[in-house]
């Protein structure tokens, strides 16, 4: 075990046993607020990921949909006769419309059935397009998880330097020139590392991070609902 590792362990134990009141080394402006927000966003990544996954799969429903699948005569082509497919709710509605379109070729029900079928088949396709966009955001969340690991290491470094510097400044030992020089170096490193960590946390929170993911998810859902509404307007 090298000296730095031993020092890190000793510092970690000391920080846990003795709560330090930082009177000599304040955090840089905005750091504390950004860190609090960052930790909340970081700890919510799974919730966001789960909500996106739900948006991607809700159309497959639960027991009601499974019951509908078992009762429907899903024959859309000769090649599919006798085959079972796990249709989504939009495809299932489209197939219902297709069945109605076969009842009396000249009837108004037939025409409505065709329009109904087309609308829901189109919506099913739009849903796949939305899912493709949402899949990109799930990948982004995975990247953010990796990014958070790097940020946490930098936050730990900030915490360690701050502790060492606070102890150095509070030391009652006479300051030799080398000690003053070391203290100045530590202070410079603390400020530089803090700025780097703050920048990365703000990026994680902002449009390049979690906020951007939420915006993209909302945009994908909006596009889907707008296209779906337009398709349904044709069923008259």
Swiss-Prot record:
One GO cellular component term: spore wall
Compartment annotation: Spore wall
Domain of life according to the entry: Eukaryota
Gene3D superfamilies attached to this UniProt entry: Arfaptin homology (AH) domain/BAR domain (1.20.1270.60)
Region of interest called Disordered, as start-end residue ranges on this chain: 169-188
Family of the protein in this entry: Belongs to the SWP12 family.
Protein name (database record): Spore wall protein 12
UniProt source species: Encephalitozoon cuniculi (strain GB-M1)
């Amino acid at each position: 075990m090298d000296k730095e590792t031993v020092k890190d362990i000793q510092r970690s134990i000391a920080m846990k046993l003795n709560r330090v009141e930082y009177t000599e080394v304040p955090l840089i402006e905005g750091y504390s607020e950004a860190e609090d927000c960052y930790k909340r966003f970081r700890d919510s990544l799974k919730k966001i990921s789960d909500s996106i996954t739900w948006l991607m799969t809700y159309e497959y429903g639960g027991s009601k949909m499974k019951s509908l699948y078992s009762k429907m005569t899903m024959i859309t082509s000769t090649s599919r006769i006798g085959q079972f497919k796990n249709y989504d709710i939009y495809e299932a509605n489209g197939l219902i419309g297709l069945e109605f379109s076969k009842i009396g070729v000249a009837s108004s029900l037939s025409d409505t059935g065709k329009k109904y079928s087309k609308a829901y088949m189109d919506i099913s396709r739009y849903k796949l397009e939305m899912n493709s966009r949402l899949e990109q955001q799930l990948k982004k969340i995975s990247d953010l998880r990796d990014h958070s690991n790097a940020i946490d290491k930098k936050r730990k470094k900030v915490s360690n330097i701050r502790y060492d510097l606070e102890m150095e400044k509070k030391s009652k030992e006479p300051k030799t020139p080398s000690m003053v020089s070391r203290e100045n170096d530590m202070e410079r490193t603390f400020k530089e590392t803090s700025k780097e960590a703050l920048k990365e946390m703000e990026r994680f929170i902002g449009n390049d991070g979690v906020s951007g993911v939420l915006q993209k998810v909302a945009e994908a859902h909006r596009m889907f609902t707008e296209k779906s509404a337009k398709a349904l307007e044709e069923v008259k």
